Swiss-Prot record:
Similarity comment: family membership: Belongs to the universal ribosomal protein uL2 family.
MF terms (GO), sorted A to Z: rRNA binding; structural constituent of ribosome; transferase activity
UniProt biased composition (Basic and acidic residues): 240-250
Organism: Chlamydia abortus (strain DSM 27085 / S26/3) (Chlamydophila abortus)
NCBIfam families on file: rplB_bact (TIGR01171)
GO biological process: cytoplasmic translation
Name of the protein this chain belongs to: Large ribosomal subunit protein uL2
Length: 284
């Protein structure tokens, strides 16, 4: 769900924000009448200094980054390797470091961990990991244990490496086929990809599926997120960009990147390098 705002100011005219209806409030945990969001678990969060888009030498390696509000990083369990122990969902929380929501699990032995929250998971639900787990929302198991047509997310690329694929808000992959040793998945991009049958994945779709419908409404909200302005090459000087300079506007050049490479349509992929694990390319 998302909410729109009355156009009281120019910044709220186009503004569309998530409603956060799926998130657990402090009132639900304490029994008091309050809509405040749940504070992150202290043992599973720490302050992470922003790089500002700079590498270890101080050079800009990623443009348009810098500033923004400080963030606490939440430690997420992407491996889901605590097998055979039931866990109860304590809360579904907001995470500023990713587009999806996260869920705090409390295991039967007392340990707590954060996981990516699947769409539809609620406070009080039970989940479990490992072989023999029930085919239920939020449970984690190997791909060979999943029936054909299953919807999965947080998928490993190699066994025991931790989930790498399909982790953004609203995404899901589908189990299409099984062969000896491998499972074929249809990825959100449309690509068909083979993975080792021992790779783990979590059942369900990633939460916050309306994330792509949100509109920031003003430049200031982008700055709060740590996103800086993108300047056009034609507005720069010749020293700064291949499109820079000139008396007025001129269009006598092939569009290029800031580093001089031809852009818009130039194929840069080596045809000789193929990936045997990709059954069907998303570009074809």
């Amino acid at each position: 769900m998302f909410k729109k705002f009355k156009p009281v100011t120019p910044g709220t005219r186009q503004l569309v924000l998530p409603a956060f209806d799926e998130l657990t409030t402090q009132g639900e945990l304490s029994g008091k009448k309050t809509r405040k969001s749940v504070r992150p678990n202290k043992k599973l969060s720490f302050f992470k200094k922003s790089s500002g888009g700079r590498d270890n030498l101080g050079h800009i390696s990623c443009r348009h980054r810098g500033g923004g509000a400080k963030r606490l990083y939440r430690v997420i369990d992407f491996k889901r390797n605590k097998d055979g122990i039931e866990a109860k969902v304590v809360s579904v929380e907001y995470d500023p470091n990713r587009s999806a929501y996260i869920a705090l699990l409390s295991y039967a032995d007392g340990e707590k961990r954060y996981i990516l929250a699947p769409k539809g998971i609620k406070r009080g639900d039970q989940v479990i990991s490992g072989e023999g787990s029930p085919f239920k929302l939020g449970c984690c198991m190997t791909l060979k244990s999943m029936p054909l047509g299953s919807t999965v997310h947080n998928i490993e690329m190699r066994p025991h490496s931790g989930g790498k694929l399909v982790r953004s808000a609203g995404l899901a992959a589908q189990v299409i086929a099984k062969t000896p040793g491998y499972v074929t998945l249809k990825m959100p991009s449309g690509e068909f990809r083979m993975l080792n049958e021992g790779c783990r994945a979590t059942i369900g779709e990633v939460s916050n599926s309306d994330h792509n419908l949100c509109v920031d409404g003003k430049a200031g909200r982008k700055r709060w997120k740590g996103i800086r302005p993108t300047v056009r090459g034609t507005a720069m000087n010749p020293v700064d960009h291949p499109h820079g300079g000139g008396e007025g506007r001129h269009n006598g050049y092939i569009p290029r990147t800031p580093w001089g490479k031809v852009t818009k349509g130039l194929k840069t992929r080596d045809k000789r390098k193929s990936n045997k694990w990709i059954v069907k390319d998303r570009r074809k």
